[in-house]
C-alpha cells in the first residue's frame, strides 16, 4: 500500500512539473507574439505619421500656389 502511495505521489508530482513547464513555454510564446504585434503597430504609426507629414506639406504648397495665383 505504501509503495502505491509513493508511486502515485511521484506520478502526480511529475505531472505537475510537466504542466508547469508547458505553461511557462506557452507564456513565453505569447510574450513573443505580443512583442511582434507591438513592433508592427510601431511601424504602422511611423508610416502614418510620414503620410500625414507629406499631406500637410502638399496642402501648404497648394495653398501657397493658390495665393500666388491671385
Curated annotation (Swiss-Prot):
The keyword Secreted applies. One of its GO terms (cellular component) is extracellular region. Residues 23-43 form a propeptide. It comes from Pithecopus hypochondrialis (Orange-legged leaf frog). Expressed by the skin glands. Has antibacterial activity against the Gram-negative bacteria E.coli and P.aeruginosa, and the Gram-positive bacteria S.aureus and M.luteus. Has antiprotozoal activity against L.amazonensis. No hemolytic activity. Residues 1-22 form the signal peptide. This is Dermaseptin-H3. Its main location: secreted. It holds the Pfam family DD_K. Keywords: Amidation, Amphibian defense peptide, Antibiotic, Antimicrobial, Cleavage on pair of basic residues, Secreted, Signal. Belongs to the frog skin active peptide (FSAP) family. Dermaseptin subfamily. Residues 25-44 are annotated as: Disordered. Residues 30-40 have a biased composition (Acidic residues). It comes from the Eukaryota. InterPro entries: Dermaseptin_dom, Frog_antimicrobial_propeptide, FSAP. It is found in: Secreted. GO terms for biological process: defense response to bacterium. The modification Leucine amide is found at residue 70.
